[in-house]
Amino acid sequence: MKQLKRYFLSTVGLLMMSSTAHSQSKLDGYIAEGLTNNSVLQQKQIDVEKAMIALRIAKSNYLPTVNFSGTFSTAKGGRYSDLPVGDLLNPVYATLNQLTSSSSFPQIENQQIDFLPKNYYDAYVRTAVPLVNTDIIYNKRIEEQKTVLTQLDLTLYARQLVNDIKVAYFNYQSSVQAVGIYKKALATLEKNIALNEALIANGKGLNIHLMRAKSEWETTNAQLIQAENQQRNAQTYFNFLLNKDLSSPIENELVVADASTISTDVSNREEINLLEQSKSIQQTVLRMNELFWVPRLNAFLDLGSQGVEWEVSSKSAYYMVGVSLSIPIFNGTRNTQKVKLSEWNLKQADLAIQQTTQQLSLSVQLALNALSTATANYESSLKQLAVAEEYFHLIE
């Protein structure tokens, strides 16, 4: 988790550093707040942590596994084997008894040995370790690449979130400016109405001018109501991105972007890096599928005890060492088809990278053109505003 936090903080720092070349203290503060509190971004962080856990699981496949196993069985009947020990030894025992004038050698019966044991147990601890297994090697590499993939996905969403916060902030700024403009327009129209009423009272005005002024006031007032509603909507959406109370106030700060500071290089964009990492995963999968012919070799060691009637002694204890080898010979061409499928996936990844690069280059160029146009219109509007203010003061 500490590693994840360090990665996330570095991501936030890079995004904050690249957010603008000008001082935007208030906007930067909102961006940092959004990157910290956004619930979707927190889910992405959990995805990174899960990918790291999956990587640790893949690495653990190199380690030995230790398991305890035990069986108990009892049986009666079934296959058996006759052992004529009585027929073989009783004549000898009888002769020995005659020679020794004693009964030291009793007569014994023939024995029947059952193949199915009665009250038999076998308990052991098995330690197994893989010696040769290419699947384990490449699965670990794939999980490493998936971890990087989830980190890139986190960075990509963080960048998109920064963009959404900026757009929402600028929309809120625009709505605030629009409300201010309509309020000033209403104040000017109210002065115009009062002026026309005074002219009419002195017999120097026309009712049509007064009616037109009142009509313009009603139209502007309706536009003001609409602008105030847009301002509330912009405020609500901006606070939603920051995971705050939807009615929280927003500090307003005029920020003007500079098109000259925007980079047109898309080669290091998160979208491209994400697709490049996906391609690397496909390459690893292809290599793993191509090595389907490599044998799997495992070794094991058993330490245990076996016997009947739960007898445990030095004689019942045992150990067993062994190796297992698996060599693929034929499985219906499934492995060959997997290789072909991986090759097509790799070609598809290359095409996706090319298409995304072109789309990003196009979107950047269109955005720069739109920004240049908006900047020119803004500068022209400032000049028109200065002329209009001077004209208004002259006629006032």
What spans do the regions from the language model cover?
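Periplasmic alpha-helical coiled-coil/stalk elements that build and connect Gram-negative outer-membrane
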Residues: Q3, G29, I53-L55, L152-N268, ...
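Primarily recognizes Gram-negative and organellar outer-membrane beta-barrels
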Residues: N37, N67-F115, K204, T264-Q277, ...
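Small/polar (Gly/Ser/Thr/Ala-rich) solvent-exposed segments
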Residues: Q42, T65-Y80, Q112-K118, A128-L156, ...
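Amphipathic alpha-helical coiled-coil segments
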Residues: Q43-A58, Y157, N163-G180, A198, ...
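Membrane-embedded beta-strand positions in outer-membrane beta-barrel channels/transporters
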Residues: Y124-R126, Y169, N298, G322-S324, ...
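Bacterial Sec-pathway N-terminal export signals of envelope proteins
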Residues: H22-R79, K204, L242-Q283, T357, ...
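Transmembrane beta-barrel architecture of outer-membrane proteins
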Residues: Y120-D122, V167, R212, E276, ...
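Terminal intrinsically disordered/low-complexity segments used for targeting and assembly
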Residues: M1-E33, S69, G78-N110, E228-I262
